[in-house]
UniProtKB/Swiss-Prot annotation:
Enzyme class: transferase
EC number: 2.4.99.17
InterPro entries documented for this protein: QueA (IPR003699), QueA_dom1 (IPR042118), QueA_dom2 (IPR042119), QueA_sf (IPR036100)
Protein family membership: Belongs to the QueA family.
Molecular function as annotated in GO: S-adenosylmethionine:tRNA ribosyltransferase-isomerase activity
Keywords: Cytoplasm, Queuosine biosynthesis, S-adenosyl-L-methionine, Transferase
The protein's name: S-adenosylmethionine:tRNA ribosyltransferase-isomerase
GO terms for cellular component: cytoplasm
Gene this chain is encoded by: queA
SUPFAM superfamilies, A to Z: QueA-like
Localisation per UniProt entry: Cytoplasm
Subunit structure: Monomer.
Any Gene Ontology biological process: queuosine biosynthetic process
Length: 351
């Protein structure tokens, strides 16, 4: 398939630049993968769509204030966007500058030259940077970093984003983009799902800035996914196995939860074992033709045209069903992308 097969026209005004006043106030497009049937609902209806014995799998990554402004000691402004924390003192980052820093260059980061750092090495498009401070990278980012809002939210970050561009169940710092399907869940909805007999499990996938990179090939077979760190611990494996054994559904909240679970499933197939815990990097690329091992239902936001994420949704619900749902969403003025509305999709078998 061609990347252009996943294009759709999106009016600029449908890109959500701010979240709704309440997390659960978003709209929800329900798509039945088998038939392509569409129903228009509100996000609170997730409670009615869930069944006792279902397992909701959430991504508990925490977004770090990953964007830092500063300058080179030799002069010239720079903007640093953390891609990955390497250790307590070092990061791998994207750097925007009129002239890229070279190994050994001193950087002064923070609006008031708060922290000194050194450019250590370049790895393709990424820069390895080491801080010269008693504080850890996370402490420094919390102090001088900005929330890394996606490029299509064309406004500066605000204090409110520190709460709203974060899920209520975040636990493990490391992401530079939110697992956005989870932004719609508040504590009240989580408690109501629990009361209904729904079970929860938490994977970790630290979303990298690569999630916003455009696909730069024409044929999707030629695309190579960026790498992201994943944790699927033993308790998740146990919960998935128990749910399957009892006839419940695995409901992945977000494409990152899908990629985490399916990475673990692929790893088990490769090793010739049952599902086992998975800790490591994944470059899994899910597009039409992929056979899902674990996930039965997907809760996900509306994604960018020609992105790997709309390809994943097309693999899950069927290409025609997905593109038709997106056209209907545009016609019905759903809000798109990170702060936008959501979908509840049941898997189409043998897509």
């Amino acid at each position: 398939m061609q990347v252009s097969d996943f294009h759709f026209d999106l009016p600029n005004e449908l890109i959500a630049r701010y979240p709704q006043p309440e997390r659960t106030a978003s709209r929800l497009l329900q798509l039945t993968g088998e038939t392509g049937n569409i129903q228009h609902k509100g996000f609170k209806d997730v409670l009615d769509l869930a069944e006792s014995g279902d397992l909701f799998v959430f991504n508990n990554t925490r977004v770090i204030p990953a964007r830092i402004f500063g300058r080179k000691a030799s002069g010239g402004k720079i903007e640093v966007l953390v891609e990955r924390i390497l250790d307590d003192k070092s990061i791998l980052a994207h750097v925007r500058a009129s002239k890229s820093p070279k190994p050994g260059n001193e950087l002064l980061l923070g609006e008031n030259d708060d922290y000194q750092a050194e450019m250590i090495a370049r790895h393709d498009t990424l820069f390895e940077i080491r801080f010269n401070s008693d504080k850890t990278v996370l402490e420094i980012l919390e102090e001088v970093g900005h929330m890394p809002l996606p490029p299509y939210i064309d406004r500066p970050d605000e204090d409110a984003d520190k709460e709203r561009y974060q899920t209520v169940y975040n636990a493990k710092p490391g992401a530079v983009a939110a697992p956005t399907a989870g932004l719609h869940f508040d504590d009240k909805l989580m408690a109501a799902l629990k009361a209904k007999g729904v079970n929860f499990a938490f994977v970790t996938l630290h979303v990298g800035a690569g999630t916003f990179q455009p696909v730069r090939v024409d044929n999707i077979d030629d695309h190579h996914m960026h790498s992201e760190y994943v944790e699927v611990p033993q308790d998740v494996v146990d919960a998935v196995n128990a749910t399957k054994a009892n006839g419940g559904r695995i409901i992945a909240v977000g494409t990152t939860s899908v990629r985490s679970l399916e990475s673990a499933a692929q790893d088990a197939v490769k090793k010739g074992t049952e599902l086992v815990p998975f800790f490591g990097d994944t470059e899994i690329f899910i597009f039409p033709g992929y056979e899902f091992q674990l996930v039965d239902v997907l809760v996900t936001n509306f994604h960018l045209p020609e992105s790997t994420l709309i390809m994943l949704v097309s693999a899950f619900a069927g290409y025609e069903h997905t593109m038709n749902a997106y056209l209907q969403a545009v016609d019905n003025k759903y809000r798109f992308f990170s702060y936008g509305d959501s979908m509840f999709i049941t898997r189409r078998n043998n897509v």
